[in-house]
Amino acid sequence: MAAAGAGAGAPDRAALTVGPGMDMPIMHDSDRYELVRDIGSGNFGVARLMRDRRTMELVAVKYIERGEKIDDNVQREIINHRSLKHPNIIRFKEVILTPTHLAIVMEYASGGELFERICKNVRFSEDEARYFFQQLISGVSYCHSMQVCHRDLKLENTLLDGSPAPRLKICDFGYSKSSVLHSQPKSTVGTPAYIAPEVLLKKEYDGKTADVWSCGVTLYVMVVGAYPFEDPEEPKNFRKTIQRILNVQYSIPENVDISPECRHLISRIFVGDPSLRITIPEIRSHGWFLKNLPADLMDDDSMSSQYEEPDQPMQTMDQIMQILTEATIPPACSRINHILTDGLDLDDDMDDLDSDSDIDVDSSGEIVYAM
């Protein structure tokens, strides 16, 4: 989950205290946001549910330790996410620099991950899957119109608001790439189950076309309740998953009832040659996608008009870049600890334990390198 908080032009505003039993920042009571509870953690740090004292609005705040963790992925996430304003995308609010962390403040989606919903249901009915897929494509289409490809679309990066008919919200733009700001993607990023074959070939690829493949994996999981390219005998063998992706080796189980139209759409998405794969505009005109399509998803202009501008002025790009530059400087306590532990050589023996594989997959299934 992604979250963050910052006051425009006031990087020194957030004093920190340390919570019981943890070495993570809590914004001081005098600050704008107050802690409600922790809501997640990952390689980045922790995400917390916070309350805006002025508006009483709940927000999600992602804390990333200052220093080397403020890398290109973090900067890309913030720069790209800041430009996106759409009902199916988690809203970026601001960044705050604390003495020890960079905090990214964003909209809170109280309905949790779409992944959690599918786990509870095993799989969705075709109508329910279509309802969420329509929203996913609406959000992805908007991203692409803004020249941003996500590159890590998956159920875990799609959140739901708390409404009775949940609205899907795309989050986590840490791997996203803008064709305006960046070159064509070359790096292998994302989660193996969702990665398009051309991404695995270590050549330049069209990030928008790769996003289409990932959307197809999401659709398949919703209607089937399993990943399309996992080996049924060894579902956690990620190397086999990668090989099956490269061979476009998948099937729909006989016991799963899916309409011919849905099967056709899936078959048009899972095409190994990206130049022959269905595009987002073509998906939006596909018969299966158009069935029961909500009126507000038919027109991009009407979707944009639903986006309410925040009361507070948005931080300028210059302000954000200044905060990011300062965030790359480690906190003083970390520098002292580094000096103290550096002389002990505690980590020397660990340097020889690097994996010798070309494609490095950790136990969670994340691709953990970039060419």
Swiss-Prot record:
GO biological process assignments: abscisic acid-activated signaling pathway
Catalytic activity: L-seryl-[protein] + ATP = O-phospho-L-seryl-[protein] + ADP + H(+); L-threonyl-[protein] + ATP = O-phospho-L-threonyl-[protein] + ADP + H(+)
UniProt-annotated location(s): Cytoplasm, Cytosol; Nucleus
Pfam families in UniProt: Pkinase
Induction notes from the record: Neither induced by hyperosmotic stress nor by ABA.
Source superkingdom: Eukaryota
InterPro entries: Kinase-like_dom_sf, Prot_kinase_dom, Protein_kinase_ATP_BS, Ser/Thr_kinase_AS
Residue span of region C-terminal: 282-371
Keywords on record: Abscisic acid signaling pathway, ATP-binding, Cytoplasm, Kinase, Nucleotide-binding, Nucleus, Phosphoprotein, Serine/threonine-protein kinase, Transferase
Signal peptide: none
Enzyme class: transferase
Residue numbers binding ATP: 39-47, 62
Cellular component terms (Gene Ontology): cytosol; nucleus
EC numbers: 2.7.11.1
Domain Protein kinase: 33-289
Mod. after translation: May be phosphorylated.
Residue positions of the active site: 152 (proton acceptor)
Tissue: Expressed in leaf blades, leaf sheaths and roots. Expressed in shoots and roots of young seedlings.
The keyword S-adenosyl-L-methionine is assigned to this record: no
Regulation of its function: Activated by hyperosmotic stress and abscisic acid (ABA).
Family recorded in the similarity comment: Belongs to the protein kinase superfamily. Ser/Thr protein kinase family.
Domains: entry comment: The C-terminal region is necessary for the kinase activation in response to ABA treatment.
Function: May play a role in signal transduction of hyperosmotic response. Together with PYL10, PP2C53 and SAPK10, may form an abscisic acid (ABA) signaling module involved in stress response.
Assembly behavior: Interacts with PP2C53.
UniProt name for this protein: Serine/threonine-protein kinase SAPK8
Organism, scientific name: Oryza sativa subsp. japonica
